[in-house]
Amino acid sequence: TDTVYGIGCDLMNRKSIERLCHVKNIKPHKLNLSFICSDLSNISEYARKIDTPIFKILKKALPGPYTFILESSSKVPKILDVNKKSVGIRIPYHNIPLAIVKQLGNPLISASIKDDDIIKEYTTDPEEIYETFKHKVDIVIDGGTGGNIASSVIDCTGEKIVVVRKGLGDVEFLGLWSDIRPGKNSNI
């Protein structure tokens, strides 16, 4: 993506999601993965009603290196078979994941490819990724050397907007919005 390499699958394919969990060694009920969507209208299917101030932030930041935690729609638990109240959603500024999402017609569910190395947090070399995952996944796409800084994670589910992780995406513009309470300031 526009941040670090990720591993993902079709959000609507339960067997692929189970396989992704197996590859990442994650228990399905502890799933904390993000969805890669193609555009803002795509987000509305997977997030509950988005208030105007939050929508303005999404519109300003996306596509870009941000993951927004939003209240999940009723569609999310049915897909993932878990009772998740929130979901991380991304629209990366990168042609490869956006082309995959458009071709599938569904978002991708994804997770960053972490590295066991204590010096570097993320694997950035596509050849190294291929060697690690070639027998575990259907395809590895070489998008060139990846970045080593993850997306900024912004939680929009509480009383105030909270920066959970400061990553590649500039969060300074959120200073203007720090006192917004979702659902309370819809006139902004």
Kindly give the residue locations of the regions a language model identified.
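Active-site-adjacent structural elements in enzyme catalytic cores
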Residues: D2-I188
